[in-house]
Design a protein with these regions (language model features):
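Serine-esterase "nucleophile elbow" of acetyl-processing enzymes
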Residues: 2-71, 83-90
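Structural recognition of the beta-strand scaffold that forms the well-ordered cores
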Residues: 26-29, 64-69, 93-97, 135-139, ...
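Surface-exposed cleft-lining segments at the edges of enzyme active sites
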Residues: 36, 68-74, 103-115, 144-149
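Catalytic-core regions of hydrolytic enzymes
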Residues: 70-92, 108-120
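Active-site microenvironments of hydrolase-like enzyme catalytic domains
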Residues: 92-107
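Active-site segments of SGNH/GDSL-like serine hydrolases
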Residues: 97-101, 124-156
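Charged, glycine-enriched surface loops/patches
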Residues: 113-138, 162-170
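Catalytic His-Asp segment of secreted/periplasmic serine-dependent ester chemistry enzymes
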Residues: 140-240
Length: 240
């Protein structure tokens, strides 16, 4: 897909590509949240929901949707393994959700400042655009800071994603703001499996926000998944 280098142009080109015949390669990367292990208890993760919407309901059966996220990783890990994580897949669209581990303090790894994190995000965007692909930045979802105090800086890192998206004119999916809204400004308990990993309903919420931001909503008789995910989120909020 040609390089557009602005969020508005990227969205327009993506919309055109979605109604075209040429297959697209989608790379979804990040940390444990995107990796999608354990915390959904066997239910689909948000990349898997995206796969169903793109290759099922949108009927883009020749598209390839690849999840290269790895639990515990930071943005620096993705940049250091760029070939395997992104470049080798010859992507047309690359989505990134990272920051939950970058924001952590007190562990064995060197602490990262929001400024260093933002610089790495900028590097990521430049590299993606250098491949001729559309970059998509997602803020990490809001968490239960009281029970994960080592990640108390998560809001600063979400703000850094927003700044980079604005400065570099990148499509932004603000999952942090969405989770905060779903929790009415507090922790959205029904969407979390632990203080910072979304559960199956949380992944439904992530998938809905990403689907909406990228204009992926299918229309007509095949449009089933979005309504199902909306129901899952509503039910989880009531239980939470």
């Amino acid at each position: 897909m040609p390089n557009a280098e602005s969020a508005t142009a990227d969205l327009r080109r993506l919309a055109d590509a979605l109604v075209g015949a040429e297959p697209l390669n989608w790379v979804i990367t990040g940390d444990s949240i995107t990796h999608g292990l354990v915390h959904t208890q066997g239910v689909r993760s948000y990349p898997e929901h995206l796969h169903e919407i793109i290759r099922g309901e949108r009927e883009r059966v020749r598209d390839v949707v690849v999840n290269t996220a790895i639990s515990g990783h930071r943005i620096s890990d993705i940049l250091d393994d760029w070939g395997r994580r992104v470049e080798s897949w010859r992507p047309d669209v690359v989505t990134l959700m990272i920051g939950t581990n970058d924001a952590a303090t007190g562990g064995e790894r060197t602490e990262v400042s929001p400024e260093e994190y933002a610089s790495s995000l900028h590097d990521f965007v430049v590299r993606v655009r250098g491949l001729g692909a559309v970059p998509v930045l997602q803020t990490p979802p809001a968490i239960d800071v009281a029970n994960a105090p080592e990640r108390a800086r998560i809001g600063e890192f979400a703000a850094a994603v927003r700044r980079v998206a604005a400065d570099d004119h990148v499509i932004l999916v603000d999952q942090f703001a969405r989770f905060a809204a779903l929790g009415d400004g507090e922790v959205p308990w029904g969407l979390m499996n632990d203080p910072f990993h979304p559960n199956a309903a949380g992944h439904a919420a992530l998938a809905l926000e990403l689907t909406t931001a990228l204009g992926l909503h299918p229309a007509g008789a095949r449009s089933r998944t979005v309504a199902l995910l909306e129901g899952v989120v509503v039910a989880a909020r009531l239980r939470g």
